[in-house]
Amino acid sequence: MNKPKRILLYGFGPYRQFRDNITVRIIKSLPRQAGLKKIVFPARFHRAQFVEALKRFKPDMVLGLGQSARRRIDVESQAINRRRARRESKPKPISLRGRQRLKTTLPLKIGNHAGKSTSAGDYVCNFSMYVMLDHIRRYDLDIPYGFVHIPHDYDETEATRLVETVLLRCQRT
């Protein structure tokens, strides 16, 4: 029997005006399973927390979840080298020597439930994507990476089912 793939699944705690984050509820409601490492990161621009998770867990693939103000679930196709904290008027680069855009590498299919997005915004979701994809690229790691944005008011049960389906597909690939 094949050993289960090590999948790093992460989301974020509360941030800004949101006292709750749907990604926390989804991650907590998923059953424990072999090979699945679930992490809820604080919503901060702290590069080390993302790199350390990659180094410590040594995943075969990574799936990030983020809360959005959008109306539909979106699969993010790239991370952009920019970040902006609440009080900053202009975005800043995440990496002064990094590429402008980094493509996600985990082909995610969520059926008719999701759209495809080319911008994960300027906040922590995009920051985490960029930092992890940049680390994977710089160290030539064979770790497929994907990211899904889920609306903050989306049906939690349905969102959890969709994430479970994605995780099952990841185990099979």
Please provide the spans of the model-predicted regions.
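N-terminal catalytic or cofactor-binding beta/alpha core of small enzyme domains
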Residues: 1-123, 132-145, 151-173
